[in-house]
Every structure is written in C-alpha cells, then in structure tokens.
Amino acid sequence: MIDSPRVCVQVQSVYIESQSTPDDERFVFAYTVTIRNLGRMPVQLLGRYWLITNGNGREIEVQGEGVVGEQPHIAPGEEFQYTSGAVIETPMGTMQGHYEMVDVDGNAFRVAVPVFRLAVPTFIH
C-alpha cells in the first residue's frame, strides 16, 4: 500500500438541533466531506473507516464500502463532496479515520482524515 499526499480531505461538521433530543442523550451531527484529487491520475474511493469518540471517551468504529452508497471516481483536479451524519450520546465528541483508495494502475493507498470535532455550539468543555 502506498501513501499519497495527492488527495486532500476537508470536513465541516454541524449540530442538527431539530433531530437531537439532549434529554435522551441523543446528539445528531451532520458532516460534509470534500475529497480533492490534487494528483495527475484518476483515483477511486473504495472504502471508509471512522473512529467516533463521544465526550465520555466511548469509541465506536465504523467501516464499509464506499461513502453514501457510492465508490466515486475522482479525476485529476476534481473533487467529490458528500454529507453524512453521526449520532453520539454527549454534546461533544470527535471523529477521525481514513479512506481506502486505488489509483488508475490499481495501486491501493490510504488517505487519512484528521480528527474533527462534533460539538453543540453552546457547549463549553
């Protein structure tokens, strides 16, 4: 497996108050991921891995094929964007992980997704 600095990942998260029920320890977040291919060759996203940690340190691992039902091909200079969600039991938590990808020659590589916060805007820790 090769390491590729040619794919860039950015994530924005937002608290979904209308779907959350804090009294039931249910905090819903949406996150939008933008994956940019900065390289010269097309790439394809095959799978994902997430480590979701709530404010109490409880961890959940999620892995699977593709994202939002797709295994997108991303041409050089192009980007793929999708929105998904996470539900945790505390008003603050984190997510991190990686994407399993392959280039046009069939070389597999991972793209890390650095830690990002899931936080209710009014919550101060």
UniProtKB/Swiss-Prot annotation:
It comes from the Bacteria. One of its GO terms (biological process) is error-free translesion synthesis. Residues 1-125 form the ApaG domain. Pfam families: DUF525. Gene3D superfamilies: ApaG domain. PANTHER family: F-BOX ONLY PROTEIN 3, POLYMERASE DELTA-INTERACTING PROTEIN 2. This is Protein ApaG. It comes from Enterobacter sp. (strain 638). The gene is apaG.
